[in-house]
């Protein structure tokens, strides 16, 4: 049996066990949010990589959004001038949310959360701001150099999520639900460190009890 079929079978088994699956139209909104955010990354020359469940979905067959996930995860790289360029992006988005199609909420020093920018009536039609379903968000985690090389997330509550020297560069691009985004050179190493040897087997984690609200 192929790994693609195996992963699909496991997802189906989890669905039968009551795993919450992110609604299809929420996934479409989320992917469009990610596409718009990455366009801003490119515009402002921001160096980034996928991380967390997004990177896991890109690496593990079928290379797409994990059904039980509920957001997108990116990390800001510690390259020269990158943090300055990123916050220029943040300033631009906050000043032009309608034109960018996205907005953001600062949870510094750790993360900036990007959300879709849409009229309240449109959000209502899409069923957003539902307390039982996390709204689509794209989290960009701020990083800092790590002693001995590599980087870690500022104020990170996940001590095993870090990169050693040589695990990030050279960057690669990976397909994720039909999109192509930047990824670290050796993602398997961080997965083994963070999730353990069974990282290829899908596992469901509970959704948060609250979500960022869209406008």
Predicted feature descriptions by range:
Residues 6-9, 26-29, 46-57, 200-203:
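Short, well-structured secondary-structure segments
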Residues 86:
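A solvent-exposed, acidic/Ser-Thr-rich amphipathic alpha-helical stretch
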Residues 53, 74, 138-140:
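A structural signal for short, well-ordered beta-strand segments
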Residues 1-21:
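Juxtamembrane luminal stem/stalk of type II transmembrane Golgi/ER carbohydrate-processing enzymes
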Residues 77-79, 143:
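Solvent-exposed residues in well-ordered beta-strands and their adjoining turns
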Residues 48-49, 53-54, 66-68, 169, ...:
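Tryptophan-centric aromatic hotspots in well-structured domains and transmembrane helices
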Residues 19-42, 90-184, 188-193, 202-215:
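Conserved catalytic core of two-metal-ion nucleotidyltransferases
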Residues 38-72, 79-83:
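Active-site nucleotide-donor binding segment shared across nucleotidyl transfer reactions
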């Amino acid at each position: 049996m192929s790994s693609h079929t195996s992963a699909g079978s496991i997802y189906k088994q989890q669905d039968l066990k009551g795993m919450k699956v992110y609604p299809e139209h929420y996934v479409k909104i989320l992917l469009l949010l990610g596409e718009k955010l990455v366009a801003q990354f490119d515009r402002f020359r921001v160096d980034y990589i996928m991380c967390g469940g997004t990177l896991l979905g890109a690496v593990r067959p079928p290379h797409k959004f994990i059904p039980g996930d509920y957001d997108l995860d990116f990390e800001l790289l510690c390259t020269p001038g990158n943090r300055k360029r990123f916050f220029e992006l943040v300033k631009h988005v906050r000043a032009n949310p309608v034109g960018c199609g996205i907005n953001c909420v600062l949870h510094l020093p750790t993360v900036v959360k990007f959300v879709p920018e849409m009229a309240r009536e449109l959000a209502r039609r899409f069923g957003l701001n539902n307390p039982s379903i996390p709204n689509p968000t794209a989290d960009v985690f701020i990083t800092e150099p790590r002693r001995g090389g590599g980087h870690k997330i500022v104020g990170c509550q996940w001590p095993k999520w870090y990169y050693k020297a040589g695990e990030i560069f050279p960057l690669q691009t990976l397909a994720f639900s039909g999109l192509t985004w930047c990824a670290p050179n050796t993602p398997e190493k961080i997965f083994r460190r963070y999730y353990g040897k069974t990282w290829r087997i899908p596992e469901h984690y509970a959704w948060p009890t609250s979500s960022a609200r869209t406008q």
